[in-house]
Amino acid sequence: MPLPQDIRPVFQDIQDTLVRAEAPWIEQSPMAKVKVLWVGRETGTWASLHHWKKGYVAPRHKHLAGAHAYVLSGKLQVRDGVLNAGDYVYEPSGVLHDETTALEDTTYLFICNGAVLFFDENGFTRYTNWEVMEKLRAQADAQATPRAEAAE
């Protein structure tokens, strides 16, 4: 039966995003790595998995948009509280964070709707946004391709 209206996507390149479990992690430091799951260019939102080894300290930062975090395993010291496996936190736009510390090896899902600015006592040090995450994903894909071709 035909549909009463045309509901085909206006943009024909719209498609699902699938990231396999074996997708590569990107090392950001010896104590921290990230796996980029999705980048939404049209909204500036991105989704990523982060794995921090016990003792890793993330620098002070400010959220320029809301963000969601869900702890899959481990334990994080965030401001004056502790997030455990199974805990969810929403961080609104404008929130300032002091250092965040991994109290155990920790993996968490992070969905951010905009940029995050990092700073120290001397001021702004760097930022992360969808463009940075897109570059990281492209870098990981490029590194994974030779391994996949070698396996064939």
What does each model-identified segment do?
Residues 29-62, 92-96:
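Conserved short histidine dyad/triad with adjacent acidic residue
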Residues 1-44, 124-152:
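A short, N-terminal "cap"/entry segment at the start of jelly-roll beta-barrel domains
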Residues 78-98:
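Short acidic-glycine-tyrosine-enriched beta hairpin
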